[in-house]
Amino acid sequence: MNPLAQPIIYSTIFAGTFITVLSSHWFFTWVGLEMNMLAFIPVLTKKMSPRSTEAAIKYFLTQATASMILLMAILSNNMLSGQWTMTNTTNQYSSLMIMTAMAMKLGMAPFHFWVPEVTQGTPLMSGLLLLTWQKLAPISIMYQMSSSLNVNLLLTLSILSIMAGSWGGLNQTQLRKILAYSSITHMGWMMAVLPYNPNMTILNLTIYIILTTTTFLLLNLNSSTTTLLLSRTWNKLTWLTPLIPSTLLSLGGLPPLTGFLPKWVIIEEFTKNNSLIIPTTMAIITLLNLYFYLRLIYSTSITLLPMSNNVKMKWQFEHTKPTPFLPTLITLTTLLLPISPFMLMIL
């Protein structure tokens, strides 16, 4: 990618997201989504290869289809109700089409097949943007429409996403695909609580972004993209050996780490609404996520490579790029649970 084009591309991505998040008019919301989508395609092909080109095409086709469905829903809602504001989407069919379009953009099941493939075909940092920043605009639309969503359809999509994300990551050895399936599971948890308490969705999204950003930065420091490369952490960057397992356990939602907080408050919210079967099912299925995180932890801190030349301790470690925000992110990833009452009081 041309260095001169990078500021323009990233500025367009951020501007498109902010236009969508801050707008209450359907036309400007759609324009922001299109700006964001078209500017993100060069980021996916930052390192030109057949795999990245394929990933960009898959991303474009999926997002363009979702945008077409969204535009059709916006126009039909305007024809039937005469309203352009997002909070006045009263037509049931328009609401269903908008939910379908947003599920495609978020990568929720059964529209999730593009997420692992696109994430696998991009560099780690582009994958980080795909799984974090690109979720903000669709979730903001769902947040503003939370009062007019079809609860049964949303819960069905959420449970399907949790199942697809948990089962899909079981036999994977590619770290980017594992994190993509983890993202699908987290999207299911966020959308499940949206009709009951939208603020809990925002809390879940914030913690998810912190955990995912920390994980990607640690893997990028180690240049790890597979479980085999992850097992070389101890003799390449020794100080990462305790940090990667703790981050992965938090991403899996194990108490007393930060990742347990969103699952705790979501289950509590369902309990307040006299719903026990749905959160129990979600929690049991999510245990599969914890299983494949434990596999990664085993590869990082316990497994030794069979090649003797690769397992010798290096006498001089590699210099890594400075990451000033990483200590703060690691602290937030592991130690945020004790201040959760204060966070819940703000919400």
From Swiss-Prot:
The protein's location, in the record's own words, is: Mitochondrion inner membrane
UniProt source species? Pan paniscus (Pygmy chimpanzee)
Complexes and interactors: Core subunit of respiratory chain NADH dehydrogenase (Complex I) which is composed of 45 different subunits. Interacts with TMEM242.
GO BP annotations, alphabetical order: mitochondrial electron transport, NADH to ubiquinone; mitochondrial respiratory chain complex I assembly; reactive oxygen species metabolic process
TM region positions:
13-33, 55-75, 96-116, 123-143, 149-169, 178-198, 201-221, 247-267, 274-294, 326-346
Q: Which residues form the signal peptide?
A: none
Q: Which family does it belong to?
A: Belongs to the complex I subunit 2 family.
Q: Which GO terms describe its cellular component?
A: mitochondrial inner membrane; respiratory chain complex I
Chief subcellular location:
mitochondrion
Can you provide one Gene Ontology molecular function annotated for this UniProt record?
A: NADH dehydrogenase (ubiquinone) activity
Tell me the organism's taxonomic lineage: Eukaryota, Metazoa, Chordata, Craniata, Vertebrata
Q: What keywords tag this UniProt record?
A: Electron transport, Membrane, Mitochondrion, Mitochondrion inner membrane, NAD, Respiratory chain, Translocase, Transmembrane, Transmembrane helix, Transport, Ubiquinone
Name of this protein: NADH-ubiquinone oxidoreductase chain 2
Chain's role = Core subunit of the mitochondrial membrane respiratory chain NADH dehydrogenase (Complex I) which catalyzes electron transfer from NADH through the respiratory chain, using ubiquinone as an electron acceptor. Essential for the catalytic activity and assembly of complex I.
How does the UniProt record describe the way this protein sits in the membrane?
A: Multi-pass membrane protein
Reaction(s) catalysed by this chain, per the record, are:
a ubiquinone + NADH + 5 H(+)(in) = a ubiquinol + NAD(+) + 4 H(+)(out)
Q: Which InterPro entries match?
A: Complex_I_Subunit_2, NADH_DH_su2_C, NADH_UbQ_OxRdtase_chain2, ND/Mrp_TM
What EC number(s) is this enzyme filed under?
7.1.1.2
Q: Which gene encodes it?
A: MT-ND2
